[in-house]
């Protein structure tokens, strides 16, 4: 099974609409063929319209950083998955460690969001990963397997084949500790084996798994050489056009 690599920038709470347009103008003629590498930017909700307009006709896919699990209602401050689809959004990040940590999102919330995203014809990027405390207790596999089982509950094999899972070791973010490419591969392999156990081998071979711990131009080739790593969920290194281009064109 040949999986198309997917490099996704997660801008977090950075960039305004003007900066967004400037960024896309700088990269859109230099992106790889989407059959080789899928290039994706996930932007703050306030930038999505500018991002979509600037990227029109290019190889850049558009993603949101979050959404709610209801299409409409009295949910002040939330983002509707139905409206995201109407805007032309392709992917939505859910379950990011910052959402779980700062905003107390639960596995149940993330599962509901995954179902809402599929119901509206988009694809979720489901994040998972363990803390330093969990890693030092050697419980990382149990932790991540439990997250995956909860996130995928009730999804069909066809749906799981089309989504993206992003492994982000929380212990390697801002701690001075670094996950080696072998550690990243070990966990991505565990995730794939979990999907196989829950569904079947074909589904496990289809699902794309990203690594999301300080991916940058200097380490992207080594990470992408690993058999179970199909892409990167990139934070800071995706904010600069030249850096983002170096990441998505890592095969050159």
Curated annotation (Swiss-Prot):
Gene Ontology BP terms: gluconeogenesis; glyceraldehyde-3-phosphate biosynthetic process; glycerol catabolic process; glycolytic process
Question: What subcellular locations does the record give?
Answer: Cytoplasm
Among the Pfam families in the record, one is TIM
What pathway, per the record? Carbohydrate biosynthesis; gluconeogenesis; Carbohydrate degradation; glycolysis; D-glyceraldehyde 3-phosphate from glycerone phosphate: step 1/1
The residues that cross the membrane are: none
Family annotation (PROSITE patterns): TIM_1, TIM_2
- Gene3D superfamilies per the UniProt record, alphabetical: Aldolase class I (3.20.20.70)
**Reactions that this protein is recorded to catalyse:** D-glyceraldehyde 3-phosphate = dihydroxyacetone phosphate
- Tell me which EC number(s) this protein carries: 5.3.1.1
* Binding sites annotated in the UniProt record for substrate: 10-12, 174, 214, 235-236
Q: What would be an example GO MF term here?
A: triose-phosphate isomerase activity
Task: Recite the UniProt keywords alphabetically.
Answer: Cytoplasm, Gluconeogenesis, Glycolysis, Isomerase
Positions of the catalytic residues: 96 (electrophile), 168 (proton acceptor)
Query: What's an example GO cellular component term for this entry?
Result: cytosol
Subunit and interaction comment: Homodimer.
- Family that this chain belongs to: Belongs to the triosephosphate isomerase family.
Q: What does this protein do?
A: Involved in the gluconeogenesis. Catalyzes stereospecifically the conversion of dihydroxyacetone phosphate (DHAP) to D-glyceraldehyde-3-phosphate (G3P).
The protein, known as: Triosephosphate isomerase
Organism of provenance: Lactobacillus acidophilus (strain ATCC 700396 / NCK56 / N2 / NCFM)
Source taxonomy: Bacteria, Bacillati, Bacillota, Bacilli, Lactobacillales
Q: Which gene encodes it?
A: tpiA
């Amino acid at each position: 099974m040949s999986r198309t690599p997917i490099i996704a920038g997660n801008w977090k709470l950075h960039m305004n609409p003007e900066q967004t347009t400037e960024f896309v103008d700088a990269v859109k003629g230099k992106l790889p063929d989407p059959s080789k590498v899928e290039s994706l930017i996930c932007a703050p909700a306030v930038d999505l319209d500018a991002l979509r307009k600037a990227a029109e006709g290019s190889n850049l896919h558009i993603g949101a950083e979050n959404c709610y699990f209801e299409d409409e209602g009295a949910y002040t401050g939330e983002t509707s998955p139905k409206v995201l689809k109407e805007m032309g959004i392709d992917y939505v990040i859910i379950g990011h460690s910052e959402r779980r940590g700062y905003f107390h999102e639960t596995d149940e919330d993330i599962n509901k969001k995954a179902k809402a995203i599929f119901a509206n014809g988009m694809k979720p990027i489901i994040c998972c990963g363990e803390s330093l405390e969990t890693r030092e207790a050697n419980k990382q596999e149990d932790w991540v397997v439990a997250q995956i089982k909860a996130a995928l509950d009730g999804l069909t094999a066809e749906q799981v084949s089309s989504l993206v899972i992003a492994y982000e070791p929380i212990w390697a973010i801002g701690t001075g500790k670094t996950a080696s490419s072998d550690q990243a591969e070990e966990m991505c392999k565990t995730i794939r084996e979990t999907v196989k156990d829950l569904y079947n081998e074909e589904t496990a071979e289809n699902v794309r798994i990203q690594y999301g711990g300080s991916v940058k131009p200097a380490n992207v080739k080594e990470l992408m050489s690993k058999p179970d790593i199909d892409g990167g969920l990139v934070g800071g290194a995706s904010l600069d056009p030249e850096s983002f281009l170096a990441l998505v064109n890592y095969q050159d």
